[in-house]
Amino acid sequence: MHKNAPFKYGKFPNAQCYNITPNENNNGYHIGVIFVIVKDNEIVAWADFKGTTYDVNPVPFTYYNIMDLAYDYNWFNHDTLAHIEGVGFDISYSSYSLCPMSRAHGKDASYLSIRKRVNFKRSTEYVGGLFVKDNKITRISYPLSVSQKDVDVDLDLTENNINRIASVYFDIDEKIVVCGYELPPEEKAEAIEVELEISVDDQIFNAFMNRG
């Protein structure tokens, strides 16, 4: 699987494009090549070698979701699919994703849901969530089935903080796939992490110890 230039066709201009080619030479735009269209780390469509696009229900850009789509649309046989690898990039094997609870809100979504893929099936289960305002995480939310109060925090919305919270509060040992939501630019996020590294750890730990 190879990363291509941004897709220029259909209703997803400038979305990231990856091609899955059935041979080892990556011949480019030949008959049989499949293009996976990704926007904000979600698979939103796929295209054939003619550039014809086919919308899909948005799902996190992970190896297992690529497998699901390949089975759905009969792209390749099982043996070929089982050996798909990222060339020049890493495919995520995580079972966990963080996405806006309501897609109608887009980038202004105030609630992001942590979900876990169940038994490598299309279904997912709710694990918890984050309330977000102005790119700040303001509250960590638990499922109603868990006898645990929500926890108020004041943390920058960065990939690093998201994964720290997932580890401390939800015992998740996999990297969270953030999709459907645009995080602050990486340069800014890195600067924030360096500046607040100690205070963020203290805040997460203290809030965790004081939960009730």
Swiss-Prot record:
Pfam families per UniProt: AdfA (PF23813)
InterPro entries xrefs: AdfA-like
Secreted keyword on record: no
A biological process term (GO) from this entry: symbiont-mediated suppression of host innate immune response
Keywords associated with the record: Host-virus interaction, Inhibition of host innate immune response by virus, Viral immunoevasion
Highest taxon, organism lineage: Viruses
Family: Belongs to the Anti-DarT factor A family.
Biological function: Plays a role in counteracting the host DarT defense system, when mutated at Arg-164.
Protein name, UniProt field: Anti-DarT factor A
Lineage of the species this protein comes from: Viruses, Duplodnaviria, Heunggongvirae, Uroviricota, Caudoviricetes
Gene responsible for this protein: adfA
